[in-house]
Amino acid sequence: MDINFNKNEDYNKLLVSDLKRRFAKVKLGGGQKRIDKHHEKGKMTARERVDYLLDSKAKSIEIGAFAGEDMYAEHGGCPSGGVVVKMGYIKGKQCIVVANDATVKAGAWFPITGKKNLRAQEISIENRLPIIYLVDSAGVYLPMQDEIFPDKEHFGRIFRNNAVMSSMGITQISAVMGSCVAGGAYLPIMSDEALIVDKTASIFLAGSYLVKAAIGESIDNETLGGATTHCEISGVTDYKAKDDKDALDKIKFIVDKIGDYDKAGFSKTQSFEPNENQDDIFGILPKERNAQYDMLEIIKRLVDNSEFEQYKEGYGKTILTGYARIDGWAVGIIANQRKLVKTKKGEMQFGGVIYNDSADKSTRFIANCNQKKIPLVFLQDVTGFMVGSKSEHGGIIKDGAKMVNAVSNSVVPKFTIIIGNSYGAGNYAMCGKAYDPRLIVAWPSAELAVMSGNSAAKVLLQIETASLKKRGEEITPEKEKELFDKIKSRYDKQISPYYAAARIWTDGIINPLETRTWISMGIEAANHAPIEKKFNMGVLQV
């Protein structure tokens, strides 16, 4: 019996249990009372609508489930950003579905709501996937209008994207299933086809109260902008539905008729489960963040038949590169090796650190995968690039820049899984959010920061104590420890995967056992979009 394995297993399974507990809370949206009120009106909730629309026997993944987590407390919170986004299948066709959650502030748009909607559109655009909008929103959340209204990546960008996506031939279908007011009224009408539910849905630029105040006209909302008005008088909407299910059934009927398009042509064969037990991941991944482990053992539990053909196996060993298949899809894997390695020259290299040789190897491997049209999968557990005179004299900045250049200019789809540490420039080189991964998710064991909590707290403590001493204050060991603990506590909260997911720095936090599904669905989505751009790294320092 391996005691460390068992300790690791217990710890990591507790993290997954906590993930499930948090997600169960998120699924309640604005709470059970608001859900009950929704049902009393004869309406389905956002999650019920999405689940009814998607093929029940097919897989689906939820994007941004933890958006808004622990944010906006002074406004009552915004669970899941007030909108549900899933990638799944409708009548066998892969789609993105976006549904406003009217149990959260009547579906009003918080800043994070806008960011999440834009992320959903970005995924649709990159992968040429049809996107379905289920609209039930009171519009912009007015107390925070200055953070959602006028900037480039704010509310207005949604409608700009509607227009651009339509010109690209990306199918957009909207169903108005509740309120659709003010600027938000443009979203369904800028879609290819728009549906509206009778009696419970309405569309107008200004509601009855505002109309009365502005021009003195007395009119009820149903007459002003209900289903009959827009389907029979204004011609704004295309289909009238008798209730939510009827609207969703009509969407299924429409999506079923969408024709097929050219594919990217990524290699796909029969899928096989890993030969190694996937549950072992929980015991392999150490509880202690600075402990060593063999990343190869993690890879074997993620890839088909546990087969991984390493590229330059004996060179640049702090990064593992090689070819495999995941659910039948060919992939090139770039993963941080977390155990201490020894080079042929006898040099010991720390796991999780990017050295000159590993950066050089990764750059070449990325180029090879682009040459062969093989999607890239990055498995992050990185503390950064090697520092010190030896590395600087060896040109670590130059070699690191080459790797970042290759990642930046890669034209094959990239997918990033943050397993453990994701620190500093290591995050960049290993395809962090800024480098356009088609999907980026974290395991519950992940941390995202400029540096580790301990390192950051020590640096910040030095700055704080120096400042206090300048003011003539005495710093006792007790006071120093109190300051350190306070700083570290604040920093630890910020490096949590939930902090990152709340701000949509990642697309979600997942059970490690769901990793294959996310990668497989991501590559299938990417296969809808042929690669049009040629791979070119531009000028390199050599």
Task: Outline where the language-model segments fall.
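Ligand-binding clefts of soluble mixed alpha/beta catalytic domains
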Residues: 1-542
